[in-house]
Regions:
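A short, N-terminal "cap"/entry segment at the start of jelly-roll beta-barrel domains
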Residues: 1-33, 68
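Conserved short histidine dyad/triad with adjacent acidic residue
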Residues: 22, 36-52
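Short, charged/polar surface micro-motifs in flexible loops or helix N-caps
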Residues: 33-34, 43-45, 62-64, 108-109
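Structural motif
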Residues: 35, 64-66, 73, 89, ...
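Short, conserved beta-strand element in jelly-roll/cupin
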Residues: 40-42, 53-67
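Short acidic-glycine-tyrosine-enriched beta hairpin
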Residues: 71-86
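Ligand-binding loop in jelly-roll beta-barrel domains
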Residues: 86-109
Length: 109
């Protein structure tokens, strides 16, 4: 985490830029009990199917994401969120447009 973002009002849209043919991430808070990470996915890019031991809160802040959880695909648009349940396989793709999201993971049972 960078101390340069603490105790400041910042515009999320400008903290992370899209990069051609890439997925870019920036961890903005990391604590023993959880993390907050910003992601920017260029169109056509994504994260392959995986699972995590904790629930994950995904808030799309720009564009539109295709998020598949346990085989069911959801379209999540700017201003919307979805919770990916612990231990369920999930994948994320920028199919229709590039998108930015905030991932919040709380490490608790």
């Amino acid at each position: 985490m960078n101390d340069d973002i603490k105790a400041k009002a910042l515009n999320i849209q400008f903290l992370l830029d899209y990069q051609k043919d890439s997925v870019v991430s920036r961890e903005v808070l990391k604590k023993e009990l959880g993390t907050i990470t910003f992601f920017a996915f260029d169109q056509g890019k994504g994260l392959s199917e995986h699972s995590a031991p904790f629930d994950a809160f995904v808030q799309v802040i720009d564009g539109e994401a295709e998020i598949t959880i346990s085989g069911k695909t959801h379209t999540v648009s700017s201003g919307e969120f979805i919770i990916m349940p612990a231990n369920e396989p999930h994948a994320l793709q920028a199919v229709i447009s590039p998108f930015k999201m905030i991932l919040t993971m709380i490490k608790s049972n």
